[in-house]
A protein has these predicted regions:
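Charged docking surfaces used in two-component/phosphorelay signaling
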Residues: 18-26
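Alpha4 helix (beta4-alpha4-beta5 surface) of REC/receiver domains from two-component response regulators
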Residues: 65, 88-106, 112-113, 117
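Hydrophobic/aromatic residues positioned on beta-strands within the core alpha/beta folds
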Residues: 84-86
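Active-site residues of response regulator receiver
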Residues: 11, 55
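Receiver (REC) domain active-site loop signature in two-component systems and cognate sites
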Residues: 58
Length: 134
């Protein structure tokens, strides 16, 4: 029996968390949610995810701040991440900070089938963790 892929969803919108989590759980993924970036980082350390769906705009620490902190950890340097934003402008200053942080950028609203496809795409990008670096 194969272990299901672990997905972490970080978003301050409870409706988004519940909707995405339910859809991905029905697809057979093990889903964890976090309503803030700081809780999300704690989740990522305690139960390393195979992929992360991350909101851009959140209070205190935005998605880019989360990603910088995540990438500072050797074990998460290459964890596939999608930043999902309701901002329709690709020229958003927060998005310009993503240079070199290895993240997909997607725009809300997203249909459930798009969330599932995005998750599959992220999981296909997984790299094995080098045991010498962890």
């Amino acid at each position: 029996m194969t272990t299901p892929a672990r997905i972490l969803i970080v978003d301050d919108d409870e409706t988004v968390l519940q909707t995405f989590a339910k859809a991905l759980s029905l697809e057979g993924y093990e889903v964890r949610t976090a309503a803030s970036p700081l809780i999300g980082l704690q989740e990522a350390v305690e139960t390393p995810p195979d992929a992360i769906l991350l909101d851009l705009r959140m209070p205190f620490v935005n998605g880019v701040g989360f990603l910088y902190r995540l990438r500072a950890q050797v074990a998460h340097r290459h964890t596939p991440v999608a930043i999902i934003t309701g901002d329709s402008c690709i020229d958003d200053p927060a998005l310009s900070e993503l240079h070199g942080l290895e993240a997909e950028v997607c725009f809300k609203p997203m249909w459930i089938d798009e969330v599932v496809t995005l998750t599959r795409t992220l999981l296909a990008k997984r790299r094995p963790i080098d045991p010498l670096l962890s």
